[in-house]
Amino acid sequence: KSSLGLGIVRFEEQPEIVRKKIKGDYLVDHEKYINAIQVYQETLKDTEENETNMGSQFTGSIYNNMGCAYASLFQMNEALTCFQKANEELHTKASLKSWLFAVYMSKGQDAYEQMCTERKVDAETKREMDRQITEAMQVELPHDLDEALTAWTREYHKNTGL
């Protein structure tokens, strides 16, 4: 069988709840963020209502990916909430960093510094995050700003269906 055929068989063997999450992941990969968020919300609702035994890893990864979708739409408050919930489920360095980056982007430097202190972020991780934030903030604007804005607007409408 082809690898595609095997992938489809493996997909079909997954529980319905896992297939829904995979669909959300696929939509994020293809920049269909609003649809992905809706699928993730349905998946979380199904997980709660059906008391599925998928565990905190599964729930945390849904919240993380939903946070990424919201962040891609520049809806940082929603992203922040999702990343916080993801970190509560996952308790990983990566999930903590995503949450702290969202704090920085939505609430600013002071809130970020305060949260790093509250969460007792170690010095090495803090330096690494500060460096990544500095790099992320060094954006070069395109030479033809009008053309770039038109392209970005077109891309946003394509990704949101608006």
Segments from the language model and where they lie:
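"A position-specific structural signal for the A-helix of alpha-solenoid helical repeats
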Residues: P15, I22, F58, N65, ...
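Terminal, low-structured helical/coil segments at or just beyond the last alpha-helical repeat
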Residues: Q114-L162
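Flexible helix-coil transition and linker loops at the boundaries of alpha-helical arrays
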Residues: G7-E12, K45-Q57, T92-L96, E118, ...
